[in-house]
């Protein structure tokens, strides 16, 4: 009879989890929010990073909401027309990003943009993949802006509140 150590079982479980994620992410694209075209890995990664860094402490519905806002911006003529450009939109001076002058604060806060919590990161990848490959109802009501409920940005005074989800307030 074989005996497996707890460490060996844990490593095997992590390997299987990575493998399943890889299979899931590489599945054929289905019609959905991605306008029925294949989604590139960069778009998936950019959307997942935005979900991870903007909403990793939220319930799953709040994480989906952040992803939906990102996609709503891609569809809006006032924003760039691809996911990565929306996520990394920032003010630059001499080709350098100005700290705290970007659309999503995690990108220009001076901290690492590498996800540390792998379990939460894989959850963000799955949410991003679902949003890009399936028709997910936009329960944010078309929101293009949001902020955490513990701050009141200047821009929010001129926006109409559409919905509150978790720790975020969403605007048109």
Label for each model-derived stretch:
Residues 30-172:
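Bacterial extracytoplasmic/cell-wall-associated proteins, especially those involved in peptidoglycan
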Residues 1-9:
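Short, Lys/Arg-rich N-terminal segment immediately upstream of the first membrane anchor
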């Amino acid at each position: 009879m074989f005996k497996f150590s707890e460490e060996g079982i844990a490593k095997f479980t992590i390997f299987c989890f990575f493998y399943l994620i890889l299979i899931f992410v590489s599945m054929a694209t289905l019609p959905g929010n991605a306008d029925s075209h294949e989604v590139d890995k960069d778009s998936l990664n950019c959307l997942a990073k935005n979900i991870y860094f903007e909403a990793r402490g939220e319930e799953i519905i709040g994480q989906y909401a952040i992803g939906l806002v990102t996609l709503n911006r891609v569809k809006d003529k006032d924003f760039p027309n691809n996911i990565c450009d929306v996520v990394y939109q920032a003010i630059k001076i001499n080709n350098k990003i100005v700290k705290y002058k970007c659309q999503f604060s995690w990108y220009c806060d001076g901290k690492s943009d590498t996800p540390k919590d792998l379990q939460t990161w894989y959850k963000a990848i799955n949410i991003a993949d679902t949003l890009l490959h399936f028709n997910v109802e936009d329960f944010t009501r078309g929101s293009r802006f949001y902020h955490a409920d513990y701050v009141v940005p200047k821009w929010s005074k001129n926006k109409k509140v559409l919905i509150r989800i978790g720790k975020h307030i969403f605007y048109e």
